[in-house]
Amino acid sequence: MGKQQETILIIGAGISGLATSRLLTNNGIPNIVFEASTPDRSQGFAISLQEFGYSTLLAALGDLPLSSLIRAVAPDRQIGGTGWIDQALRDNRTGELLVAPDLTTTKQTIVRANRNALRHWIADCGEDELDVRYGHKLQSIKGKLGDVTAIFENGAKYKGSLIIAADGVNSTYSPRRGS
């Protein structure tokens, strides 16, 4: 009988935290995502995804088609849009087109994604549901690699094998890495 795999604790349910959780879950690796805010929080309107990023994500999620991503996350999807960015430069005052790539010879490589829609799409890209615990703001961490405990401001404590800090630039955990 094989040794049971320890749970990986992920701090932050933004795009990176959910993508990490989805990849781990799809590969049978137990994990829990902890998010300080509520499920209905906004994370900003949109993000631009470059081809090297979305193609890698689509491949990692099981060679999903690009059309699946675009249909789910393009900010203009509800009016038939595709989210593609034309990369044209316009005069801010007049709207006059200053420079634009020739789209008959230039491949479109940047797609705009609604952040909330992208988070939902990532969470739904698999057979198994992600385990996301909202209302869990990290307070402290005890232990070492292989045996860590995350302690949250709401009094909850969770043990795991390691912690992945995916809670952004104002990370609760990242400043503690050196200590």
Swiss-Prot record:
UniProt-listed Pfam families: FAD_binding_3
A GO term for molecular function: FAD binding
Function: FAD-dependent monooxygenase; part of the gene cluster that mediates the biosynthesis of neosartoricin B, a prenylated anthracenone that probably exhibits T-cell antiproliferative activity, suggestive of a physiological role as an immunosuppressive agent. The non-reducing polyketide synthase nscA probably synthesizes and cyclizes the decaketide backbone. The hydrolase nscB then mediates the product release through hydrolysis followed by spontaneous decarboxylation. The prenyltransferase nscD catalyzes the addition of the dimethylallyl group to the aromatic C5.
Positions bearing carbohydrate: N92, N170
Entries under InterPro entries matching the protein: FAD-bd, FAD/NAD-bd_sf
Family: Belongs to the paxM FAD-dependent monooxygenase family.
Cofactor: FAD
Enzyme Commission number(s) from the entry: 1.-.-.-
Enzyme class: oxidoreductase
Pathway assignment: Secondary metabolite biosynthesis
Keywords: FAD, Flavoprotein, Glycoprotein, Monooxygenase, Oxidoreductase, Signal
Positions contributing to FAD binding: E35, A46, R119
Protein name per Swiss-Prot or TrEMBL: FAD-dependent monooxygenase nscC
Signal peptide: 1-21
